[in-house]
């Protein structure tokens, strides 16, 4: 059985409180590949209990978890030493790096090298969501010090796997890729079966509830608040690790719920009002496959996850969102038809399609 090594900044179970769209996608990818390959994971932060199966093993430390400069520097040193030691003792068939670990890439150490790009950490020209002044300074310093190195990595790896056509185009432009055919779009796997009935808002006897996940300025929380003010007879429920205390009677804190089925059962329509270009839109696909209509920003990879009628192009304009919500309330037949079309779109994100795409890459 061939061996694959993943060099990851973190390896989390989807139910871990620290999990994100990227860590969930990595977890599901590794779970699928472990049915065909031996998997080694080198990561300083592992929160998976139990380890998925006997084909997966981890090299970890868990000593340097935290955001302090000391921990970050120690983590970099740990990466460097651990990757060097790993290659001294092992000869994997495939090495997989990510945005965070690609600085340690050495094409001579493995016959096939793959780079996973699910986010913007290497895009030093792009301001990150929620970036503060210190983070902005660090990004600009990285741009000065690391741009040449990162461009070299992107052009030397054998394959780049990314999570949307939007990201593919951004990678080609940002890193001046000379062989764009090596960039493979593998949509993140969504392991929610479409067995949930459509939630028709015209049949709801109680007050309709519109939901949002992780509101923040980058996620467009001002849209959420503006809609709550415009529709006082509609409940607005948000889910996050922290209670934001919005001080509006019809805005309800739903807590943090890792189980998506339980979360989506509490709302009738989801908005994804991101004001920055999301690489993909996992939550919108999960909601569609859970029977919910979803309205999304025309931003980044979000537009690839739903039918075009669910997309708002002028996504920074509150009036556009108000009009779309009113459209949803007044055109329930069209709303359901648009949801059905979005459900068809979501079929390209199912676990089986993801596995097929992965095997085409890793078997070649």
Which residues fall in each region the model found?
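Donor nucleotide-sugar binding/catalytic pocket of nucleotide-sugar-dependent glycosyltransferases
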Residues: 155-196
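Short hydrophobic beta-strand element within catalytic cores of glycosyltransferases
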Residues: 293-296
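A charged, aromatic-enriched C-terminal amphipathic alpha-helix characteristic of glycosyltransferases
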Residues: 74, 316, 333-363
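Conserved catalytic-core segment of nucleotide-activated headgroup transferases in glycan assembly
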Residues: 192-194, 199-249, 253
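Active-site proximal beta-strand in glycosyltransferases
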Residues: 5, 94, 107-140, 161
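N-terminal subdomain of nucleotide-sugar transferases
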Residues: 1-47, 90
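Conserved acidic donor-binding segment of nucleotide-sugar-dependent glycosyltransferases
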Residues: 215, 309-319, 327-332
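Membrane-proximal helix-turn-helix segments that form the acceptor-binding/catalytic region
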Residues: 28, 84-85, 136-160
């Amino acid at each position: 059985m061939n061996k694959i090594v993943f060099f990851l900044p973190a390896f989390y179970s989807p139910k871990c409180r620290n999990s994100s769209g990227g860590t969930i996608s990595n977890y599901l990818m590794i779970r699928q590949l472990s049915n065909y390959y031996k998997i080694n994971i080198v990561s300083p932060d592992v929160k998976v209990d139990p380890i998925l199966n006997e084909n997966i093993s981890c090299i970890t430390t868990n000593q340097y978890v935290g955001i302090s400069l000391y921990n970050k520097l120690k983590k970099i040193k740990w990466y460097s030493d651990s990757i060097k030691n790993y290659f001294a003792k092992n000869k994997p068939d495939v090495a997989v790096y990510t945005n965070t670990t690609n600085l340690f890439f050495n094409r001579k150490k493995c016959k096939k090298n793959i780079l996973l790009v699910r986010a913007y950490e290497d895009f030093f020209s792009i301001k990150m969501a929620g970036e503060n002044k210190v983070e902005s300074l660090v990004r600009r310093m990285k741009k000065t010090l690391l741009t040449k190195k990162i461009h070299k990595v992107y052009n030397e790896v054998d394959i780049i796997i990314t999570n949307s056509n939007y990201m593919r185009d951004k990678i080609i432009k940002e890193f001046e890729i000379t062989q764009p055919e090596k960039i493979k779009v593998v949509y993140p796997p969504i392991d929610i079966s479409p067995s949930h009935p459509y939630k028709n808002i015209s049949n709801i006897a109680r007050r309709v509830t519109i939901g949002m996940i992780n509101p923040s300025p980058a996620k467009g929380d001002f849209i959420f608040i503006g809609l709550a003010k415009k529709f006082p007879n509609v409940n607005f429920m948000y889910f996050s690790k922290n209670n934001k205390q919005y001080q509006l009677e019809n805005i309800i804190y739903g807590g943090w719920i890792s189980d998506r089925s339980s979360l989506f059962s509490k709302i009738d329509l989801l908005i994804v009002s991101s004001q920055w270009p999301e690489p993909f839109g996992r939550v919108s696909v999960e909601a569609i496959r859970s029977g919910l209509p979803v309205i999304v920003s025309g931003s980044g990879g979000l537009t690839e996850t739903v039918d075009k009628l669910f997309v708002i192009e002028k996504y920074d304009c509150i009036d556009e969102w108000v009009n779309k919500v009113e459209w949803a309330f007044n055109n329930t037949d069209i709303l359901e038809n648009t949801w059905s079309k979005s459900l068809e779109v979501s079929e390209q994100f199912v676990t089986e399609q993801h596995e097929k795409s992965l095997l085409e890459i890793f078997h070649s």
